[in-house]
């Protein structure tokens, strides 16, 4: 049984993660989101966890007989990373790829960003060795090994051709509306990917 936990499950990455996990044979995918997105998250085959009222670590542990999940995907950052790490079972991985905890309200705040940075855990390599857990930072824009990138693209293309993944499109915005599209995503109104039309 391979169980994965994805935060912001209704967004562009979360919807893709759910489909990719299923394509790789995950028996259970756990996704956190707000209550209004519950039905949508469940329609993607994920076990829904309410991000406001439930503790995802407790849910992950309870669904796995106390063992934890195989993979945790964390776009939140800050002290949320340690909670995702605690949701892992021994020998498994946490993937960090965002820092949505750095943004609160309508505008960026240096104070909020500094608080997030200060609350980011310092993972102890010795403790990680004892628990056989791994933490990965992921930034596809900075991946410079073409062979790795090519392998990922080929795998995703194969899934698309087989119908195992079908990107969920929330909305398409004209390039002139980029600020509005960003606000739509920032306010967590999207369900799937937000696309920009450059034509």
Regions found by a protein language model. Name each.
Residues 63-71:
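A glycine-rich helix->loop->beta "capping" turn
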Residues 26, 79-164:
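Glycine-rich phosphate-binding loop and adjacent beta-alpha segment
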Residues 53-58, 66, 78-82, 175:
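Structural motif corresponding to alpha-helix initiation and N-cap regions
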Residues 144-199:
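C-terminal hydrophobic helical "lid"/dimerization subdomain
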Residues 4-54, 59:
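Mid-domain Rossmann-like dinucleotide-binding core that forms the NAD(H)/NADP(H) cofactor-binding site
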Residues 45, 68-69, 165, 178:
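Local beta-strand N-terminus motif with an aromatic residue
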Residues 70-73, 95:
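N-terminal Rossmann-like NAD(P) cofactor-binding module of classical short-chain dehydrogenase/reductase
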């Amino acid at each position: 049984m391979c169980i994965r936990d994805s935060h912001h499950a209704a967004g562009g990455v979360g919807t893709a993660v759910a489909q990719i996990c299923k394509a790789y044979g995950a028996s259970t995918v756990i996704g956190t989101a707000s209550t209004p997105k519950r039905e949508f998250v469940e329609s993607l085959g994920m076990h829904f966890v309410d991000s406001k009222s439930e503790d995802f670590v407790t849910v992950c542990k309870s669904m796995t007989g106390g063992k934890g999940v195989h993979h945790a995907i964390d776009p939140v950052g800050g002290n949320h990373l340690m909670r995702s790490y605690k949701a892992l079972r021994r020998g498994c991985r946490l993937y960090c790829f965002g820092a949505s905890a750095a943004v609160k309200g309508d505008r960026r705040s240096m104070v909020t960003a500094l608080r997030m940075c200060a609350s980011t855990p310092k993972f102890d390599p010795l403790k990680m060795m004892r628990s056989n857990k791994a933490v990965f930072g992921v930034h596809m824009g900075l991946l410079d090994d073409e062979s790795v990138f090519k392998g990922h693209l080929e795998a995703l293309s194969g899934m698309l051709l087989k119908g195992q993944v079908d990107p969920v499109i929330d909305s398409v915005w004209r390039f002139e509306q980029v600020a509005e599209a960003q606000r739509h995503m920032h306010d967590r109104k999207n369900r799937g990917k937000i696309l920009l039309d450059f034509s």
